[in-house]
From Swiss-Prot:
Residues 424-453 have a biased composition (Low complexity). Belongs to the SREBP family. Residues 367-388 are annotated as: Leucine-zipper. Residues 1-477, 558-1134 are cytoplasmic. Residues 227-487 are annotated as: Interaction with LMNA. This is Sterol regulatory element-binding protein 1. The chain crosses the membrane at residues 478-498, 537-557. It comes from Mus musculus (Mouse). Residues 317-367 form the bHLH domain.
C-alpha cells in the first residue's frame, strides 16, 4: 500500500483556516442559486451557447464541453489542486473496468452542461448515502433549494489519494446506472445543503482513516443521511482564478458516464438532481445529487431503519405478487374445468368440479376399455385374413360379399365398437360405470366420427348394392297391390284374349257379308277349342301376374343391407348415437337419429299425408298376407329366390334391425317424445310388427313379444272401443311367441298372462301419459317404454285392490275369511311384479327389450309388506307378521326423502302397533304411547294435506287409522280384569282408561270421522270405535248400545226393505260384526240384554264367526268365557 502524501493534522489545520472563507462563499452561492432558480429570465445569456449542450457523455477531459472557449484550463486546475493538496496524486490501476450503461439524465436545452476546461482537473469521488427512498419529482421540474431540519450526517469513509476534502461534497453520475423500478419510489436529494451543516461534515472528514492502497482508484465512499434518500455523489474539484457560478438543470432523460464506483454493483438505479456548485478559496466544487436503489447496495451498509422498511415493503409486494399468481392459477384451473365439462357432458349440464372430474375419469376409462377391445378385434381380424390365401380372397371377392362378417354372429360389445356413434358436445359415453343417467362423450364439434379402427385393415370395401336391394317405396308397393287386385277382380286379360280371338272372325264376316251362312257356322265351330282353353289360360296369366307382384313386393322389393356396407355403417352409427341420446334424455335428437337410421336402411318414414296413407294401407295388407303365411314365406326369400343362404340371413337381420328401430320410435310416440298423430303411430306399430315377424329366428322372442304388446297398447290407445277386441288377439300372439320358443314368459310380462293382469290390460280404464304423475306407491320404470308405465299402474291397482278388500269387501262374501285371503293374494302378486319391474338396470339401448332392463321396485314391495303385516295383525297371526318385520323396518330412501307425511305416518303406525299389540306387555310404556302420538300427528297432517286425494290414498289412511284405534283398544282390554269375572258379578263396565290413553283415542277417532266425510266405507268403523270410546270413558250405556246395535243388525238384514238406503249406507263386515258381539256381551249391563241367555248366545255366535275368520287365539278366549258362563260346557260351531 502506498503512503499517503498528507496527514490528518495538516487537513484539520487547512480546514480551520478556510472556515470563515468557506462560510462566506457558501452564503454567496446559495443566494446566487436562489436568484437563478427564481428568475431565469434575468440571465438570458447564461443558458445560451456555448453552455447549452444537448448531449451527454463522460465527465472526463474528453467531453465535448472541454473544447469550449469559456471553459477553465484543466492544467491550471490540476496545478492549483496539487499545490493545495501538497503532494502528487497517486493513481493505481483500476481493479475492474466500470460498466458502460448510461444513466438517465436529461438537461434543459437553455443550460449547458458543466464540462471542465483545459485548466480544470476533475476527480470523481463517489459518495453513497444509504437511506430509504422518498417520492421522486417529475423530470424536467426545477427544484428549489430545500433545507432539511436535521443536519446531514456523514459517516467516516476512507478517501484515496487526498488528505482532506477542501469544502463541501459533490457527486456525479456513476457509470452503468439505471432508473429504479416504478414500484420502488425514489426521492430527489436536496438541492442545496446548509452551509453550517456542510462545513461541519467536511471538517469531520479530517479525522477519518485513509483507504488502503488496494482500494479502487479514484473512488471514495461517504455515507450520509439526507432526508432518508439514498444518494450517490461524485465531486468535481474545479480551481479557477475568477468566481464563475453556474447552475445546470438536469433531467432523467439524459445519461452521464463515469469511470465507475467500486461500492456500487453494476446496474444501480440512480436519479439525477440539480447541479450544485460550491466555491471555496478559489476552488469550485460542482455536485450532482443522485438517487441509488438500496437493493443494489451491500447489506452490511444498510441502516436498521432501512432494513425494517425495506422488509415490510418486500413482504407486501411478495404477498401481492403471490395473490396475483394464485388468482391466475385458479382462473386457469376453472377455465380448464369448464372446458372439460363442455367436452364431457355438454354446455347445458350443471355439475360441480368434483362431478366433472369424476365423469371425465369414467369416460377416459371407457375409452381405454374401448381401445383395448378394438385392438383385440383388430388382431382377430388380421389373423383371420392372414390365414386365408390369395386365391381364397380373390374367389370370395368374385362371389360377392364373401368376406363380409355377419353382424349377427358377433358379440354385442364387438358390434358396438365396430360402428362408433357420432360425438357431439353434450353426448354421454356409451357404457359409463355410472350407468346411463351419467354417460358422457368427448366433444369434437362435428356430427360424426370416423369409422371404428377395427375396420381399418379388415373391413371390405363397400360394394355398390344392386338396385333391388335398395327396396321399394310404399307408394310403389301399394300400386302393385292395386294392380294385383284389379287383375283378380276386373280380369282385364280375359277381355284382352277374347278380343284377340274374335277379331279374325269379325273381320271375315265384315268382308263376306254376302256369303253363305254355312261357312260362318263352320268357322265358328273351328274356334270352339279356344273357348274351353281360354279361361284357364286367363286365370293362369292372372295368377302369374299376382305372383310376380308378390315377388316384387316381398322378395325383390325388400331392402337388404349387407354387413360392413356403406348403408350398414351409417345405420349403426345413427343407431348408436340414438342410444346415447336416449341415455342422455335428449329424446327429440334420438328420434332424429332413428329417422336417419331408417333412411340408411332404405326405409324412409312418410313425410306427407299421401305417403302416410299409402304406407298404412300397405302395412295393413302385408299384415293380412302374413296372417295367411304367404307373405311371411315370401318375406323369408327376400333378396332373391335363387340367392345363397347368407343373403337370406342378412335379409332377416336387416328386417330385425328395422323392426327394432320402428318399435323404439313407436315407444317414443306413445310416451309423447315423438310428434305425430294416431295414424302415424299405428303405422309405426304395424311396420315394427310386420318386420319382426319377417325376421324369423333373427329376433329374440322377448323382443317379438314386446312388439306384440306395444301393438296391443296402440289398439287400446288409438282405435275405437269397438275394435278393442284386437287387444286380446295381440296379447295372445305375444304369449304364444314366448311359449313357442322357451316355454316361459319374460318376467316383465308375466303379469299379462295372469287373469287379473289380463283383465286389467283389456278392460281397465287407464291411459299412458308422456309425463306420468309422481306416485308414493311405485317407482317409475323406463321413461321411454309405455309398457313400463302400464306395469306401474298395474302395481298400484293391485295395492288398491288389496286395501279395498279390507275397507269395503264384496257384499256377497259368504266366507268371513275371504276378505283377508283375497287381499293377501293381491299382495303376493304385487310382490312378484315388484321383483321384476321397476327402474331400468341395464340401458336405454334401442335393441334392449323390457325383459332385459327391469329391476325391483322397492317402494311397491315396501307398501305390500306393510299391508300384509297389518292384515296378519288383524287376523291375530303374529308369527306371519314377524316374518315381514325386517322388510317394513327398512323404508326405501325415496319415501324418506318425500315431503308427503303419509309414508312417515305408515312407518310410525307400524312401530306403535308393534309395541301396543305385543300381548307379552300388560302395561303400556310411555315410549310406546309417544310413538303412537307421533303416528297420529303424521296421519292428521296427511289428512290435512290431501283432502281430495286418490282412492288408494284414502284406503291407506283408513287402514292406518283403524290400526291405531285397534292397537289402543287392545291395550285397554288387556288392562281389564277377565270378562268372565265381570259377567259373573253383573258389572256394567270395567275400569276406565287413563286420561292420556283416552285423549289419544279421541284424536284418532276424530281423524277417522274426518276421513269418513270423503270416504264412505270408513263410516262402519266410526260406529264401532265410537262405542269403544264410550266404554273406555264409562259413558251412558244407552248410546253405546245403539252404536253397537247398528253393527249387529246390519248383518242380519242383508236384503231388507229400502234397497236404496241399504246401498247408500255401507254394510258391516264379518270382522266388525264379531267385534260388536264381543263388546256387547262383555261390557253392556244385563238390563240391555233382552233375554237371560242372550249373552251366551252372543258369545257362541262370535265364536263361530271368529272360527271362520281364522283367529284361533280369539276363538280360544271365546270358548273360555263360554265355559265360565255355561258351568263347564262348551259351545261349538254348528
Amino acid at each position: 500500500m502506498d503512503e499517503l502524501a498528507f496527514g490528518e493534522a495538516a487537513l484539520e489545520q487547512t480546514l480551520a483556516e478556510m472556515c470563515e472563507l468557506d462560510t462566506a462563499v457558501l452564503n454567496d452561492i446559495e443566494d446566487m442559486l436562489q436568484l437563478i432558480n427564481n428568475q431565469d429570465s434575468d440571465f438570458p445569456g447564461l443558458f445560451d451557447a456555448p453552455y447549452a449542450g444537448g448531449e451527454t457523455g463522460d465527465t472526463g477531459p474528453s467531453s465535448p464541453g472541454a473544447n469550449s472557449p469559456e471553459s477553465f484550463s484543466s492544467a491550471s486546475l490540476a496545478s492549483s489542486l496539487e499545490a493545495f493538496l501538497g503532494g502528487p496524486k497517486v493513481t493505481p490501476a483500476p481493479l475492474s473496468p466500470p460498466p458502460s450503461a448510461p444513466a438517465a439524465l436529461k438537461m434543459y436545452p437553455s443550460v449547458s452542461p458543466f464540462s471542465p476546461g483545459p485548466g480544470i482537473k476533475e476527480e470523481p469521488v463517489p459518495l453513497t448515502i444509504l437511506q430509504p427512498a422518498a417520492p421522486q419529482p417529475s423530470p424536467g421540474t426545477l427544484l428549489p433549494p430545500s433545507f432539511p431540519a436535521p443536519p446531514v450526517q456523514l459517516s467516516p469513509a476512507p478517501v484515496l489519494g487526498y488528505s482532506s476534502l477542501p469544502s463541501g461534497f459533490s457527486g456525479t453520475l456513476p457509470g452503468n446506472t439505471q432508473q429504479p423500478p416504478s414500484s420502488l419510489p425514489l426521492a430527489p436529494a436536496p438541492g442545496v445543503l446548509p452551509t453550517p451543516a456542510l462545513h461541519t461534515q467536511v471538517q469531520s472528514l479530517a479525522s477519518q482513516q485513509p483507504l488502503p492502497a488496494s482500494a479502487a482508484p479514484r473512488t471514495n465512499t461517504v455515507t450520509s443521511q439526507v432526508q432518508q434518500v439514498p444518494v450517490v455523489l461524485q465531486p468535481h474539484f474545479i480551481k479557477a482564478d475568477s468566481l464563475l457560478l453556474t447552475a445546470v438543470k438536469t433531467d432523467a432523460g439524459a445519461t452521464v458516464k463515469t469511470a465507475g464506483i467500486s461500492t456500487l454493483a453494476p446496474g444501480t438505479a440512480v436519479q439525477a438532481g440539480p447541479l450544485q456548485t460550491l466555491v471555496s478559496g478559489g476552488t469550485i466544487l460542482a455536485t450532482v445529487p443522485l438517487v441509488v436503489d438500496t437493493d443494489k447496495l451491500p447489506i452490511h451498509r444498510l441502516a436498521a431503519g432501512s432494513k425494517a422498511l425495506g422488509s415490510a415493503q418486500s413482504r407486501g409486494e411478495k404477498r401481492t405478487a403471490h395473490n396475483a399468481i394464485e388468482k391466475r392459477y385458479r382462473s386457469s384451473i376453472n377455465d380448464k374445468i369448464v372446458e372439460l365439462k363442455d367436452l364431457v357432458v355438454g354446455t347445458e349440464a350443471k355439475l360441480n368440479k368434483s362431478a366433472v372430474l369424476r365423469k371425465a375419469i369414467d369416460y377416459i376409462r371407457f375409452l381405454q376399455h374401448s381401445n383395448q377391445k378394438l385392438k383385440q378385434e383388430n388382431l382377430t381380424l388380421r389373423s383371420a385374413h392372414k390365414s386365408k390365401s390369395l386365391k381364397d380372397l380373390v374367389s370370395a371377392c368374385g362371389s360377392g360379399g364373401g368376406t363380409d362378417v355377419s353382424m349377427e354372429g358377433m358379440k354385442p360389445e364387438v358390434v358396438e365398437t365396430l360402428t362408433p356413434p357420432p360425438s357431439d358436445a353434450g353426448s354421454p359415453s356409451q357404457s359409463s360405470p355410472l350407468s346411463f343417467g351419467s354417460r358422457a362423450s368427448s366433444s369434437g364439434g362435428s356430427d360424426s366420427e370416423p369409422d371404428s379402427p377395427a375396420f381399418e385393415d379388415s373391413q371390405v370395401k363397400a360394394q355398390r348394392l344392386p338396385s333391388h336391394s335398395r327396396g321399394m317405396l310404399d307408394r310403389s308397393r301399394l300400386a302393385l297391390c292395386v294392380l294385383a287386385f284389379l287383375c283378380l277382380t276386373c280380369n282385364p286379360l280375359a277381355s284382352l284374349f277374347g278380343w284377340g280371338i274374335l277379331t279374325p272372325s269379325d273381320a271375315t264376316g265384315t268382308h263376306r257379308s254376302s256369303g253363305r251362312s254355312m261357312l260362318e257356322a263352320e268357322s265358328r265351330d273351328g274356334s270352339n277349342w279356344t273357348q274351353w282353353l281360354l279361361p284357364p289360360l286367363v286365370w293362369l296369366a292372372n295368377g302369374l301376374l299376382v305372383l310376380a307382384c308378390l315377388a316384387l313386393l316381398f322378395v325383390y322389393g325388400e331392402p337388404v343391407t349387407r354387413p360392413h356396407s356403406g348403408p350398414a355403417v351409417h345405420f349403426w352409427r345413427h343407431r348408436k348415437q340414438a342410444d346415447l341420446d336416449l341415455a342422455r334424455g335428449d329424446f327429440p335428437q334420438a328420434a332424429q337419429q332413428l329417422w336417419l337410421a331408417l333412411q340408411a336402411l332404405g326405409r324412409p318414414l312418410p313425410t306427407s299425408n299421401l305417403d302416410l296413407a299409402c304406407s298404412l294401407l300397405w302395412n295393413l295388407i302385408r299384415h293380412l298376407l302374413q296372417r295367411l303365411w304367404v307373405g311371411r314365406w315370401l318375406a323369408g326369400q327376400a333378396g332373391g329366390l335363387l340367392r345363397d343362404r347368407g343373403l337370406r340371413k342378412d335379409a332377416r337381420a336387416s328386417a330385425r334391425d328395422a323392426a327394432v328401430v320402428y318399435h323404439k320410435l313407436h315407444q317414443l310416440h306413445a310416451m309423447g317424445k315423438y310428434t305425430g298423430g294416431h295414424l302415424a303411430a299405428s303405422n309405426l306399430a304395424l311396420s315394427a310388427l310386420n318386420l319382426a315377424e319377417c325376421a324369423g329366428d333373427a329376433i329374440s322372442m322377448a323382443t317379438l313379444a314386446e312388439i306384440y304388446v306395444a301393438a296391443a297398447l296402440r289398439v287400446k290407445t288409438s282405435l275405437p272401443r269397438a275394435l278393442h277386441f284386437l287387444t286380446r288377439f295381440f296379447l295372445s300372439s305375444a304369449r304364444q311367441a314366448c311359449l313357442a320358443q322357451s316355454g316361459s314368459v319374460p318376467l316383465a310380462m308375466q303379469w299379462l298372462c295372469h287373469p287379473v293382469g289380463h283383465r286389467f290390460f283389456v278392460d281397465g280404464d287407464w291411459a299412458v301419459h308422456g309425463a306420468p304423475p309422481e306416485s308414493l306407491y311405485s317407482v317409475a320404470g323406463n321413461p321411454v317404454d309405455p309398457l313400463a308405465q302400464v306395469t306401474r299402474l298395474f302395481r298400484e291397482h293391485l295395492l288398491e285392490r288389496a286395501l279395498n278388500c279390507i275397507a269395503q269387501p264384496s257384499p256377497g262374501a259368504a266366507d268371513g275369511d275371504r276378505e283377508f285371503s283375497d287381499a293377501l293374494g293381491y299382495l303376493q302378486l304385487l310382490n312378484s311384479c315388484s321383483d321384476a319391474a321397476g327402474a331400468p338396470a341395464c340401458s336405454f339401448s334401442v335393441s334392449s327389450s323390457m325383459a332385459a332392463t327391469t329391476g325391483p321396485d322397492p317402494v311397491a314391495k315396501w307398501w305390500a309388506s306393510l299391508t300384509a303385516v297389518v292384515i296378519h295383525w288383524l287376523r291375530r297371526d303374529e308369527e306371519a307378521a314377524e316374518r315381514l318385520y325386517p322388510l317394513v323396518e327398512h323404508i326405501p330412501q325415496v319415501l324418506q326423502d318425500t315431503e308427503r307425511p303419509l309414508p312417515r305416518a305408515a312407518l310410525y303406525s307400524f312401530k306403535a302397533a308393534r309395541a301396543l299389540l305385543d300381548h307379552r306387555k300388560v302395561e303400556s310404556s310411555p315410549a310406546s304411547l309417544a310413538i303412537c302420538e307421533k303416528a297420529s300427528g303424521y296421519l292428521r297432517d296427511s289428512l290435512a294435506s290431501t283432502p281430495t286425494g286418490s282412492s288408494i290414498d284414502k284406503a291407506m289412511q283408513l287402514l292406518l287409522c283403524d290400526l291405531l284405534l285397534v292397537a289402543r283398544t287392545s291395550l285397554w282390554q288387556r288392562q281389564q280384569s277377565p270378562a268372565s269375572v265381570q259377567v259373573a258379578h253383573g258389572t256394567s263396565n270395567g275400569p276406565q282408561a287413563s286420561a292420556l290413553e283416552l285423549r289419544g283415542f279421541q284424536h284418532d277417532l276424530s281423524s277417522l270421522r274426518r276421513l269418513a266425510q270423503s270416504f264412505r266405507p270408513a263410516m262402519r268403523r266410526v260406529f264401532l270405535h265410537e262405542a269403544t270410546a264410550r266404554l273406555m270413558a264409562g259413558a251412558s250405556p244407552a248410546r253405546t248400545h245403539q252404536l253397537l246395535d247398528r253393527s249387529l243388525r246390519r248383518r242380519a238384514g242383508s236384503s231388507g226393505k229400502g234397497g236404496t238406503t241399504a246401498e247408500l249406507e255401507p254394510r258391516p263386515t264379518w270382522r266388525e260384526h264379531t267385534e260388536a258381539l264381543l263388546l256387547a256381551s262383555c261390557y253392556l249391563p244385563p238390563a240391555f240384554l233382552s233375554a237371560p241367555g242372550q249373552r251366551m248366545s252372543m258369545l257362541a255366535e262370535a265364536a263361530r264367526t271368529v272360527e271362520k275368520l281364522g283367529d284361533h287365539r280369539l276363538l280360544l278366549d271365546c270358548q273360555q268365557m263360554l265355559l265360565r258362563l255355561g258351568g263347564g260346557t262348551t259351545v261349538t260351531s254348528s
